Amino acid sequence: MNIKELVLKLNEIDAIKLGEFKLKSGIISPIYIDLRVTVSSPPLLAAIAEMMYQKVYKSGNAQETPALVCGVPYTALPIATGMSIANNIPMVVRRKEAKAYGTKQLIEGRFKEGDNVLVVEDLVTSGASVLETVRDLNSVGLKVTDVVVLLDRQQGARQALEKQGYRLHSVFTMEELINTLIEAGKLTGRTLELVQSFLDANRNVVVPLPPTLAPPAPAPIVINKPFEERAKLASNPMASKLFTLMSSKKTNLAVAADLTDKQQLLDLAESIGSEICVLKTHVDIIDNYDEEFIKSLKCIAAKHNFLIFEDRKFADIGNTVKYQFENGVYKISKWADMVTVHGVAGSSIVDGFKSGLKEYGSGLLLLAQMSSKGSLCVGDYTTQMIEMANNNKEEVMGLICQERLPSMTDGLVLMTPGVQFNSTGDAMGQQYNTPEYIIKEKNTDVIIVGRGIYQSNDPKSVANKYRTAAWETYQSKF
């Protein structure tokens, strides 16, 4: 089947509609292409899938051979399926929204990080739908170089995609479709005039992309500042205190003491206290907790000059977190120098901490990213957490993150969990990176090490090795 035959067949099955239609891009068009009807014509659907595949690969136009294909939801899904079956290429499916049950995945199917994916779409106007799919594929480690469509409406999609490094392949353009209909006598009179006027007015007019899909502004050049300088830039007093402590003690090592016995935790703190800047606790997992434990821990912290970080991960409304922070069995506000906070309740959660923070001088650490596999702290969520931190600098001392992003200001302490010399993972989804990689390549400030230290035979000696690796890597940046 050639292009002319295909266009006429689409017209025959009423896939080409004339009238007044509002496109996803917002443009009002006198012509609308509805390729959903092709699912009722299996031979035609198979022909479309094969023509699209040939356009990319059998003509040698592809940048890279795909390991997978993925259709943009929803019209392109049957096209991608036909392409997958006919050419024996595995397929992944992108959901428009993650399920709230089952696997809860946005991208379904078997794949591995770095696989190249051919994105399949029925037609493009601005390219927004394609870029939404590319964004979600990238979020799970998949790579995209090529996009194939049946129809390019010639209204900016090609430019938008190429600007972000993706090559667009189309079987035919809107101009070719219109010319075919004119030659076949299917488009005449007043309708022809309207369509022709529309094409003349909109040919290669770039439709603006939504802000979340527009090409990012160039990242500013990051000029690393030493901790003593950043202490002066911090609006939160605890952030300033931590920067100063790290600079004077020459350590940017935090240890996650995830132990369930209070004496074991106190012994660990005494053993490694001279090596660390922060000790991270989960007080609610301690089986034999009492107030004497807190008194002892504070004495050890004062003796060895480290701060206490309660990893509570508050996530409720402001009124509730106020009581969780200041009251109850643990009375966290009275002894924790810093606590972690999720942003799911919105920025109003910060208000719940204000009275306790003011009285005891502690700081909040917002969870912008996590080290666990499949974490939902990505994309827009991460962006909003950084914005929340920047808008509440007096209360927020820093971020829990996996990398420094341009919008993270110098007054925030960046702390990264999931650090081990052996950068692999565990059976429960934790993923590890080395101290050197986190401090130098990801450009964060504090490494958080847990089992790599407290499960070792000699925690103090191992802690010293992590301290040395992290501090020397930090110093090498200047």
From Swiss-Prot:
GO cellular component entries: phagocytic vesicle
OMPdecase: annotated span: 230-478
Keywords for this protein: Decarboxylase, Glycosyltransferase, Lyase, Multifunctional enzyme, Pyrimidine biosynthesis, Transferase
Region entry Domain linker, spans: 211-229
Function: Participates in the last two steps of the pyrimidine biosynthetic pathway leading to UMP synthesis.
Residue numbers annotated as active site: 311 (for ompdecase activity), 313 (for ompdecase activity), 316 (for ompdecase activity)
Residues forming coiled coils: none
GO molecular function: orotate phosphoribosyltransferase activity; orotidine-5'-phosphate decarboxylase activity
Annotated InterPro entries: Aldolase_TIM, OMPdecase, OMPdecase_AS, OMPdeCOase_dom, OPRT, Or_phspho_trans_dom, PRibTrfase_dom, PRTase-like
SUPFAM superfamilies in UniProt: PRTase-like, Ribulose-phoshate binding barrel
Region ranges (OPRTase): 1-210
Family to which this protein belongs: In the N-terminal section; belongs to the purine/pyrimidine phosphoribosyltransferase family. In the C-terminal section; belongs to the OMP decarboxylase family.
Pathway in which this enzyme or protein is active: Pyrimidine metabolism; UMP biosynthesis via de novo pathway; UMP from orotate: step 1/2; Pyrimidine metabolism; UMP biosynthesis via de novo pathway; UMP from orotate: step 2/2
EC number: 2.4.2.10, 4.1.1.23
GO biological process terms held by the UniProt record: 'de novo' pyrimidine nucleobase biosynthetic process; 'de novo' UMP biosynthetic process; pyrimidine nucleobase biosynthetic process; UMP biosynthetic process
Pfam family, one: OMPdecase
Reaction catalyzed: orotidine 5'-phosphate + diphosphate = orotate + 5-phospho-alpha-D-ribose 1-diphosphate; orotidine 5'-phosphate + H(+) = UMP + CO2
Protein name as catalogued: Uridine 5'-monophosphate synthase
CDD domains, sorted: OMP_decarboxylase_like, PRTases_typeI
Binding site for UMP: 258, 280-282, 316, 320, 371, 430-432, 450-451
HAMAP family, A to Z: PyrE
PROSITE patterns, per the entry: OMPDECASE, PUR_PYR_PR_TRANSFER
Residues that coordinate or bind orotidine 5'-phosphate: 280, 313, 316, 320, 371, 430-432, 450-451
